[in-house]
Structures are given as structure tokens and as C-alpha cells.
Amino acid sequence: MESMSKIEAVLFDLDGTLLDSFPDFLASLENINVKSSSKKIDESVVRANVSDGSSKLLKLVFDIDTDDKAFDEHKRNFLNEYERNILMYGNLFLGVSDLLNFLLDKKIPYGIVTNKPRKYTEIILKKSSLLRQSKVVICCDDGFKSKPNPEGINHACNILGVPNSKCIYVGDHENDLNASLAAGTISGVCTFGYGFKKR
């Protein structure tokens, strides 16, 4: 790991890295499950796929394909529930507040590059004062290719005015690691998140 004296910025993934959003996702899935099915939800499946997007999550939890007639309704209902549940049950992971406060104290700018849509990310920012102090936030629908493509990380570094080689990117998914490597940033792997399966 580079010494902190060489680090000019830190960028983070959101779900599974800064934010434990699993409880919000689980509550949302359980709410639509009550309305549409009696199938018991496997929490381990939800936790293991939180970082893979809502479509994959719905396919696995409800055993439904994206071309199924009911899929669009399931997804719409889930996203409506999730919007209501954002940070109702989830929170920053243990230690994240201390880390972000440390970066603020050291005047090291931090930001977020996430595959989460802007609509939901903005709700999270409004509810978290520490995340709201991010100097840059790049979302999947901001016009850049999603991770593992490095476009979002590259743009974030440009906004911060920091060379990629002087920036750390931290994530919990292989897409995060691959995006970081492609961007030429220093890579940080968050093993307590959802994306990296136990090997």
C-alpha cells in the first residue's frame, strides 16, 4: 500500500463498500414477496448478489426471467419499495464514519463511483452527511460506461484534478477491482462487502 503522503484522493464504490444496503434490499424484497408470492426468500442469495443489480437479484430470488411477462411488474414494485426503504434499515458499515472523518481531517478529498442509478444515490446522499461531503459522485446513468469500464473512475479523477496513480479506488466486487486496474488507480479490496465470494 502506498503511504498516505502519496495519496491525493480516495474513491469508493457505494453498496457493499461504504453502505450496508442489504437490510434495505431484503425488506423491499420481502414486502413485494408478501404481495405476490408465498416463497421464502433466501437471505444468503440476497446478500451475495446485492452488488449485481436489481434485475439479477429479482431473477435469483423469484426464479423469474427478464423476458417473463411478470418481470417488469416485479422490478417496478421492487424499485418503488426500495426507494421508500433507503437507509430505513441499512447504514454505513462499521468503521466507515471513522475513515471518512480521517480523510476530512487530513484534507484528502473522497468521492463515489457507483453502478447505482443517480435517483437512489441522491436519496442516500441526502440522508448521510458524511457521504454528502463527497467531492465527486459518478452514477451509472451519468453518461459513462458502468464498471468494470474505467470511464467513471477516470472522470472522477479528472474532476478532482488528481492523477489516477495518486488515487485509491476501493470496492467490494470484481467489477470494481477490474475498473480500478484499467484506470491505473491504486486498488483497494473491501472483503467485508457483498461482491467477493469466499474462495
Which functions belong to the PLM regions below?
Residues I168-R199:
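Acidic, Mg2+-coordinating phosphoryl-transfer loop and its flanking beta/alpha structural elements
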Residues L18, F25, Y120-T121, G152, ...:
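Conserved short alpha-helix immediately C-terminal to the canonical SAM/SAH-binding motif I
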Residues K39, P109, I186:
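Residue-level detector of anion-binding/catalytic polar loops
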Residues S5-L14, L18-D98, F102, K106, ...:
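N-terminal helical cap/lid subdomain that shapes the substrate entry/recognition surface
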Residues I41-V45, K69-A70, R132-V136, N164-I168:
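Short acidic capping loops at alpha-helix termini that bridge into adjacent secondary structure
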Residues V34-S36, L57-D65, Y89, S97, ...:
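Substrate-recognition/cap helix-loop segment adjacent to the acidic, metal-dependent catalytic center
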Residues L11-D13, V113, V170:
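Generic enzyme active-site microenvironment
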